[in-house]
Regions:
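Canonical tetratricopeptide repeat
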Residues: 13, 47, 87, 121, ...
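Register position in tetratricopeptide repeats
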Residues: 20-21, 54, 87, 94, ...
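Short coil turns that delineate tetratricopeptide repeat
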Residues: 5, 39, 73, 79, ...
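Residue-level recognition of tetratricopeptide repeat
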Residues: 16, 50, 90, 124-125, ...
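TPR alpha-solenoid repeat register
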Residues: 10, 44, 77-78, 84, ...
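Conserved structural position within tetratricopeptide repeats
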Residues: 1-2, 32-36, 70, 109-110, ...
Length: 236
């Protein structure tokens, strides 16, 4: 690249090495330089935007991903286009721009209706806001149909069913999700959700067990306080 910086294949290879090393600053640099020679290469926009998002530089991520979205053409790989727009949606939602995020997700699904990451995130964020739960349930069910051994997708689907008042169905999918997770801090929410679901199913003893597990695992004080209140009050 030092001798021939316009060699896209070599740059993409170097990019993959930096991604594997989780060196996001270098990923952003390689993409930024690559766009000087290939300003229509959507992949560079995608990875640069992703790198900025992982570096918590949301404004830069949005700027780059929006430019990339403008470069999507008929010849652009459909899965790449979908991934770029889905990532834009993730960043917009993280920046508290939910309506703009949902528009980006809708566009992402036009390019790849089976983009499970997009479907899951879109469905979950709708459920968090209590919006369009029927649409959220439909999208989430699709992720479970496509990849039914992923605990994240199973948890999302169980939670949406819970919000819809389908408690017994929610318990079935929550139990399935718990088969794939260990008691680690990053999995605390699974047990928190399980506690709520079991409480609504009338099994308060099991609910308390799951809430106590969540309390033990949650690293964030705010989440621990929320679960502690449920334990003290013995209800949601």
């Amino acid at each position: 690249l030092t001798i021939e910086p316009d060699q896209t294949k070599a740059r993409l290879l170097a990019l993959q090495i930096m991604i594997d090393k989780d060196s996001m600053e270098q990923v952003a640099r390689l993409c930024r330089e690559g766009l000087l020679y290939e300003p229509s290469e959507v992949m560079f926009y995608y990875y640069e935007g992703m790198a900025y998002f992982m570096l918590q530089r949301n404004a830069d991520a949005i700027r780059v991903l929006q430019k990339g979205a403008e470069r999507i053409a008929e010849t652009t790989d459909k899965e790449l286009a979908s991934d770029l727009l889905a990532t834009l949606g993730d960043v917009l939602y993280d920046t508290k721009l939910s309506e703009e995020a949902f528009l980006a997700y809708d566009r992402a699904l036009e390019y790849n209706a089976n983009n499970v990451v997009c479907l899951n995130n879109y469905a979950y964020y709708l459920s968090v806001l209590g919006k369009k739960l029927d649409k959220a349930e439909e999208m989430s069910k699709k992720t479970v149909d496509i990849k039914g051994d992923d605990p994240i997708y199973l948890d999302t689907y169980a939670w949406i069913l819970f919000l819809q008042g389908q408690f017994e169905q929610a318990r079935i999918y929550m139990n399935e999700a718990l088969r794939y997770v260990e008691e680690t801090p990053e999995n605390a929410m699974f047990f928190d959700h399980a506690g709520d679901i079991y409480f609504r199913c009338g099994d308060k003893a099991k609910a308390m067990t799951y809430w106590k597990t969540a309390l033990k695992l949650y690293p964030e004080k705010a989440n621990r306080q929320k679960v502690q209140r449920k334990i003290w009050r013995k209800r949601i």
